[in-house]
Amino acid sequence: MVTLAYFILAASASPQVQQLTYGIAKTGQFLFPVMWVMLIQRHRPKVWPWSAKGLLFGIIFGLFVAGIMLLAYRFVLRSAPFFLSAANEIREKIDGIDIGSPTIFAAVGVFYSLIHSLLEEYYWRWFVFGQLSERTSLIKAIVFSSLGFMAHHVLVIGTYFGFLSPITWLFSFGVAIGGGVWAWLYHRTGSLLGPWTSHLLVDAAIFAIGYQIAFQIPTN
């Protein structure tokens, strides 16, 4: 619902309205877990341990995924007709939310890689996976939380490649795999440091590709 609100329903609005919608939606999303635990479950939210256990695995997995993405973009996607067509729409979106300068785009990329990735780990692994793991088996908790993590990415990817496109579902399935690995790692270590570090490396690669799409691929 959050992605639907700011990415699709507000897509034709002014940059200011889109940014405001994004801010309100994201604030609600990231406040919800704490409010749920405190007001519904009547628990004091536990601060997860920042153990380095699992950090090396997280770094290796993050670098592996980031490397695959960058290589796929460099040697396959960059010149693919379907990707060039999507690149035009991606540039329009970037301009539409008023982050079309290299400096602003880079700053947004740093924010997403460092801060937003941590907030997503807190939401999807600590809260969604954590709540599910208390109510069902480990495998089901990993699968369902990862599919939820994938779902909002489907809305974003499908906007550019088409919701019936195999590319949309291939990329989205990759997101689900990543979410599953991070949920498993969080379960094994009890720490978000490994999943967060892994996630931020992947997000950094996404924004590196996005930067090239926005400012280096010739427009059609």
How would you label these PLM feature ranges?
Residues 6-16, 76, 154-160:
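Juxtamembrane "helix-exit" motif on the non-cytosolic side of transmembrane helices
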Residues 14-19, 45-116, 134, 166, ...:
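Juxtamembrane helix-loop-helix connectors linking adjacent transmembrane helices
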